[in-house]
Amino acid sequence: MGYPKEGETIQIHSYKHNGLIHRIWNETTILKSTEMCVIGANDRTMVTESDGRTWITREPAICYFHARQWFNVIGMLREDGVHYYCNISSPFAYDGEAIKYIDYDLDVKVFPDMTYNILDEDEYDDHRKAMNYPKEIDSILRDYLNTLLHWIHQRQGPFAPEFVDMWYERYLRYTK
């Protein structure tokens, strides 16, 4: 599979289970990259939706991908603290130009005080039926939703108190 080089700027591609593109983030700077984990950052990057619409992200974000976890985490730096958006997804793959993963609709929005909301459960159920997610996938996704919630409660990995600030400081070195 390989993995991107630190300092490299790459795209992030999100797909749906049926193989169709869901969303593309145009530019993310790689801050750490190993076979197991990729950490990237972006700020005001263009995002292209599956229907061709585009928009620009509003704030700096630290992106966390793991090769064995069925979720990814985006920590967004806002005036009132770090907000997290977590996608229940396949583990990432890297093809030499982009980090790629399958977005499985379930999301968790985490606030600076570490309270959270689970989002899009109806969309998940609709897509699970429409795209015939195998029972094994459904079971894996539900297990990893619980793993993600455990990480949030324990402030593990990207939810550790200084994680996002530390990686944002490193990102600033690349933007000078």
From Swiss-Prot:
It holds the Pfam family DUF402. Mg(2+) 1 binds at residues 87, 103, 107. Its cofactor is Mg(2+). It comes from the Bacteria. Keywords: Hydrolase, Magnesium, Metal-binding. Disulfide bonds: none annotated. It catalyses: a ribonucleoside 5'-triphosphate + H2O = a ribonucleoside 5'-diphosphate + phosphate + H(+); a ribonucleoside 5'-diphosphate + H2O = a ribonucleoside 5'-phosphate + phosphate + H(+). The keyword Magnesium applies. Its EC number is 3.6.1.15, 3.6.1.6. InterPro entries: DUF402, FomD-like_sf, Ntdp-like, SA1684. The active site is at 23 (proton donor). GO terms for molecular function: magnesium ion binding; nucleoside diphosphate phosphatase activity; ribonucleoside triphosphate phosphatase activity. Mg(2+) 2 binds at residues 105, 107, 120, 123. Belongs to the Ntdp family. NCBIfam families: PRK13662.1. Has nucleoside phosphatase activity towards nucleoside triphosphates and nucleoside diphosphates. This is Nucleoside triphosphate/diphosphate phosphatase.
